[in-house]
Amino acid sequence: MARPRLKSNNAGKLMDAAERHIRQSGYNAFSFRELAKEVGIKSSSVHYYFPTKADLAAAVARRYTDRFVAALQEKSPSVRIQACKKAFREAYLTDGQMCLCGVLASESAALPEVVALEVRRFFDLCLGLLSERKEGAVTRKVALGIMAKLEGALLLARVYGAVRAFDEATRSLQ
């Protein structure tokens, strides 16, 4: 995979637009032409920053993961479950959308390998952080259940169009 050129404001704008599209409708929800139009550049210019759609989606997933993990790492291990729950809930309240890596995970069998690896990285890092709790040790098995509950709760909130569904589904998370 060619490393994208990220030193431009256009690259960031392209990633922002791609993230919105992916969170709304998945990997196949956008084309370079649509993104170029949104950002205000020629569609051929998108290839300067991201040679392929897979490169762009992988960069978006990497950035999403890095931001999410950095926010969780700032929290003490004993409050990470609640911090993760709060982050998922606030993301839904902000724009009614799904977790980027949750959406991509649902399409993982059809994703380019470079994108699927970034999605797996998100879950591996989150599971590691959630099972790192000092008080009342959380096993990997429990961490898997927590992630499944959070992703599923987002899905339910989206289906029902109400954060209440998320709250009810995650009430038992401590």
Question: Where are these predicted regions, by residue range?
Answer:
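C-terminal peripheral helix-coil segments that are non-catalytic and often amphipathic
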Residues: 1, 86-91, 121-140, 160-174
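N-terminal intrinsically disordered/low-complexity leader segments
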Residues: 1-8
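Helix-turn-helix
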Residues: 13, 17-55, 59
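Short helix-capping/turn signature of helix-turn-helix
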Residues: 50, 103-110
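Hydrophobic alpha-helical connector segments
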Residues: 59, 69-98, 143-146
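Generic helix N-cap/helix-start motif at coil->alpha-helix transitions
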Residues: 65-66
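Amphipathic alpha-helical packing segments from all-alpha helical-bundle domains
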Residues: 69, 94-98, 110-136, 141-144
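Amphipathic C-terminal alpha-helical segment
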Residues: 106, 147-166
